[in-house]
């Protein structure tokens, strides 16, 4: 039996102007899993949209994509292993391109939306030769600051080089960053560039989670939270330094740095008021961390687009961010947090203390209002359907 029988004859009649679309998700790594699932779950079985998911060992997509869409989905399981990463690096292929082409032919797909990034030039050419349009979501046009072991750094360099090459070949692009939208439009006036809002990262598993991270059982003071994958560009060392230099913060609070990744901090020299939860944080643990935090800090050195504020705003956690343009736009519009001068340790310390001493009731209301109005899944779906059907 063909693998495509998983679609279970989910073909539906198309309107005259409808373009049958296949959304391809190539990774659930880091925040990409919730990003994809929250967008995909806005669709219904009645929409002329199909789905191809590359799942890892944890079956993230199979667990988080709503059941009613499974009959129109293919879940291709391939381990996120070192050998598979090496193959992808050497061959410049995801390893399932032929399967995507098969489903496009069998179900007469007219547009493929690569929701995690740009497909290879070879894959773009193959799809175009079959009369299929390609829409690619551009996430990070330029690489962020990074401090990685040599082979990961090399992989990042190669990946961005290929991304630039793939970008030159692409015709239809979409991004979730207004600044990036403007830059893409300026650099590539011959291409069609679209924008839609970044989705909320609050999945049902996150919203309904009740699990307490075991490490927090030993916390005996209110805590300041950083949560996210550990990356150099997120400014974690800046936050660590700002906290450690303040006697007031050390006397009254703990700093919790939670997330998987390479810390690049000498944890042996950290004082007892700093707790590193340096592991993968399960979705069921996130609600507790945010609900019980005195505040959350996002000290990013750079940020193109991010969904982290959706977590803070959903749980109404007092928020402090750097004033990089992406955060500044949301904080100024929502009044849902405070900002500090990017890279300024002293200002970061002062703003943390100010946030912890202020009445945050209005801030929390602003967060709730902004979340309700701006993390609107129906609006994202409507925008994408317009793009798919050439109405924008």
Task: Place the predicted regions along the sequence by residue.
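Nucleotide-activated donor-binding/catalytic signature segment of Leloir-type glycosyltransferases, i.e.
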Residues: 265-288
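Conserved donor-binding/catalytic core segment of Leloir-type glycosyltransferases
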Residues: 215-234, 240-244, 255
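An aromatic- and histidine-rich active-site surface loop
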Residues: 96-97, 111-138, 143, 304
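Membrane-proximal helix-turn-helix segments that form the acceptor-binding/catalytic region
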Residues: 101-102, 122, 153-173
